[in-house]
A protein has these predicted regions:
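Terminal helix-to-tail segments of small alpha-helical proteins
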Residues: 1-71
Length: 71
């Protein structure tokens, strides 16, 4: 799967959370894992929106999905 997350943003987030340096392969691995997390969260939140008769995902759908996925 192609990754749509900018590597510079991934590195910046990692550094803002304690990493002093981030290798390019590590940044790519973090980006890939993050994209999969976002995809799974979106799939789950979409189920809640559809169940409520909506096409638009709302914050409440994301909150429910986070709880459902235990993340």
């Amino acid at each position: 799967m192609a990754n749509d997350l900018p590597i510079a943003a991934v590195v910046r987030i990692a550094k803002n959370n304690g990493a002093e340096r981030v290798g390019s392969d590590a940044a790519q691995a973090i980006a890939d894992a993050s994209q999969e997390y976002i995809a799974e969260l979106t799939r789950e939140a979409s189920k809640y929106a559809k169940h409520a008769g909506r096409k638009t995902i709302k914050k409440e759908d994301v909150d429910l999905a986070v709880n459902e996925l235990n993340i």
